Amino acid sequence: MTTINGGTVFDFTQRNRPVSKSVIIEDLNDFSSIHYLGSGAKGVSSSNPYKRIVFVLSGQLECTNRTTGHTWTCPEGSFTIFPGNCTTGFSAAEDTVALRIVVVNPTEIYSILEDEKAYDLKQLVPEQEDSSVFIHILSCGNTKIWAVTMVEGKFFEAETLNSNMVYMCLEGEVKITYQDKERILHENQCFYCLKDNGIHLQAGASPTRLLIMKDIL
């Protein structure tokens, strides 16, 4: 399993280098992993009862439901849901990095989301003047995922977190204060915050969009 220290700024897309026609898998925990697909890579996921939600962090993923023959494209900055109980295929014409979460016994998936469609994370949450907007994408055991849009100057904070959290900047920039130190996150960068710590986030541009992920590490 991957070990990332709390208080670390990192970029999932830079942790491994994709290899041509190959897939490198970095396990984050029992249910989530990063997949590094080199150009020309192809693969098949055998049928299992669980849905899988896949976030394409760079590149582009070509997806196939091999049971029905349906195909769809998931470009960089988007995500898709693979249905359970079917065999799925995927390929990448260019180097591609994706975060995959196996959805075991979900308690909630955002109601508008359908299987086998690509959703642009930057368009999922509308920008609202003088507001921060949160959409709860997924709850699955301890894992929870939110998409957030903030306008410049807006902030939110937690005095004490009860779980480990990853904050990923999708657009704009965000200033993070953690353990009395400030960091600036830019697009594609992540910050790992350990439970029992407080955190303060402030948007440095309009719009600033984040993906917040609980207990994926």
Model-predicted regions and their roles:
Residues 1-38, 42-44, 71-76, 80, ...:
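A short, N-terminal "cap"/entry segment at the start of jelly-roll beta-barrel domains
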Residues 26, 42-48, 65, 72, ...:
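Short histidine-centered beta-strand/loop micro-motifs
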Residues 41-43, 62, 78-80, 84-90, ...:
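Histidine-centered metal-chelating micro-motifs
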Residues 48-63, 150-151, 160-175:
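Short, conserved beta-strand element in jelly-roll/cupin
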Residues 67-84, 179-196:
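Short acidic-glycine-tyrosine-enriched beta hairpin
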Residues 84-109, 195-217:
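Ligand-binding loop in jelly-roll beta-barrel domains
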